[in-house]
């Protein structure tokens, strides 16, 4: 039975105790750890979360609504809503604001403090009539559910739409870089460039909007490329980092993708926490359907938030069950 930590984990303890940021070199070394060392790395990540994370032991829970679905012109390889793919998916235009209010109220009454309006498509470079309808939805939620943090994920934004979202009091805006930016065109999509997303992030931040930006694991990336994504997120100084685990969907190019092992995913979550001690790290897609019995482990590997109540085109878990999970996880902080 071993009595000492792996030297690279010991080095990480020493570095983080000084308050110095995790270096790319040390993160890469941690990414090469054998599976037998993962629980020690998870323990370190949980300690860092307990000491530094913005939520101070609380779980950041959010829920989303697919307010406009399908027929997206972008060719994201994992997505059922792309018209380039043949997945079966519900198709509908922007829903009525009463439906948005109904779903937001349900989440709010179950104790969920953040609610996101999500639409399919490239985004909004200008303020269009449809975008104005979304602004109206945001205003309605603020009026009728005071205290709810209203969020959105509407794709790439131009200057004017970003400024309007700030004026209407959006709390967080989600737009993911998904992978190491250098591999975006190959692994995710080539109908748009990752720099269009990065430009949106910078517009949002310049308008004072908190940015929710992360990635997806299991699309063909290497561990080193996951670390590249993690450090790109640090350079962008985002507020919330959602980490998704690919749920392969029939009719998409990734329908037969090989799953990433649980130790690899746990290492990724832990390294993300070590690189982002104070940020909210949110476990999103794949938590229930792919990780199943191991989702608690990944929450202890540095995550302090999750998406609950379902995703855009795949099922999730009911909110009451997730609230019980949150109560149990809080005992480890």
Swiss-Prot record:
Q: Which EC number(s) does UniProt give?
A: 2.8.1.6
Q: Which InterPro entries match?
A: Aldolase_TIM, BATS_dom, Biotin_synth/BioAB, Biotin_synthase, Elp3/MiaA/NifB-like_rSAM, rSAM
Is the keyword Flavoprotein in the record? no
Instruction: Give the protein family.
Output: Belongs to the radical SAM superfamily. Biotin synthase family.
Protein name in UniProt? Biotin synthase
Q: Which UniProt keywords apply?
A: 2Fe-2S, 4Fe-4S, Biotin biosynthesis, Iron, Iron-sulfur, Metal-binding, S-adenosyl-L-methionine, Transferase
* Organism the protein comes from: Chlorobaculum tepidum (strain ATCC 49652 / DSM 12025 / NBRC 103806 / TLS) (Chlorobium tepidum)
Where do the annotations place [4Fe-4S] cluster binding? 72, 76, 79
Coiled-coil spans in chain: none
According to the record, cofactor stoichiometry and binding are noted as: Binds 1 [4Fe-4S] cluster. The cluster is coordinated with 3 cysteines and an exchangeable S-adenosyl-L-methionine.
Residues that coordinate or bind [2Fe-2S] cluster: 151, 212, 282
* Subunit structure comment from the entry: Homodimer.
Q: Which function does this protein serve?
A: Catalyzes the conversion of dethiobiotin (DTB) to biotin by the insertion of a sulfur atom into dethiobiotin via a radical-based mechanism.
Question: Which reaction equation describes what this protein catalyses?
Answer: (4R,5S)-dethiobiotin + (sulfur carrier)-SH + 2 reduced [2Fe-2S]-[ferredoxin] + 2 S-adenosyl-L-methionine = (sulfur carrier)-H + biotin + 2 5'-deoxyadenosine + 2 L-methionine + 2 oxidized [2Fe-2S]-[ferredoxin]
Gene behind this protein: bioB
């Amino acid at each position: 039975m071993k009595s000492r930590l792996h030297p690279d984990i010991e080095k990480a303890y020493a570095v983080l105790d000084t308050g110095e940021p995790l270096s790319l070199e040390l993160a890469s070394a941690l990414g090469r750890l054998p599976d037998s060392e993962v629980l020690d790395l998870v323990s370190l990540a949980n300690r860092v979360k307990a000491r530094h994370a913005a939520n101070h032991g609380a779980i950041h829970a959010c829920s989303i609504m697919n307010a406009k679905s399908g027929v997206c012109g972008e060719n994201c390889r994992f997505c059922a809503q792309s018209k380039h793919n043949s997945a079966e998916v519900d198709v509908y235009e922007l829903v009525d604001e009463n439906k948005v209010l109904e779903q937001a109220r349900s989440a709010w009454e179950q104790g969920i403090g953040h609610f996101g309006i999500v639409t399919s498509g490239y985004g909004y470079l200008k303020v269009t009539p449809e975008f104005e309808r979304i602004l109206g939805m945001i205003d309605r939620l603020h009026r009728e559910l005071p205290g709810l943090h209203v969020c959105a994920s509407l794709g790439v934004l131009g200057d004017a739409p970003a400024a309007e979202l700030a004026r209407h009091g959006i709390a967080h805006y989600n737009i993911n870089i998904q992978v190491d930016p250098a591999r975006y065109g190959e692994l995710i999509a080539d109908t748009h460039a990752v720099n269009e997303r990065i430009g949106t992030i910078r517009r949002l931040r310049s308008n004072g909007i908190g940015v929710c930006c992360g990635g997806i694991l299991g699309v063909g990336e290497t561990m080193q490329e996951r670390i590249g994504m993690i450090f790109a997120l640090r350079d962008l100084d985002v507020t919330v980092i959602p980490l998704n685990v690919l749920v392969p969907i029939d009719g998409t190019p990734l329908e037969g993708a090989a799953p990433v092992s649980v130790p690899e995913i746990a290492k990724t979550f832990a390294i993300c926490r070590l690189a982002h001690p104070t940020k909210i790290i949110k476990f999103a897609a794949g938590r229930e359907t792919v990780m199943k019995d191991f989702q608690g482990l990944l929450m202890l590997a540095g995550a302090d938030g999750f998406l609950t109540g379902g995703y855009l085109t795949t099922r999730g878990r009911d909110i009451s069950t997730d609230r019980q999970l949150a109560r149990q996880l809080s005992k480890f902080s």
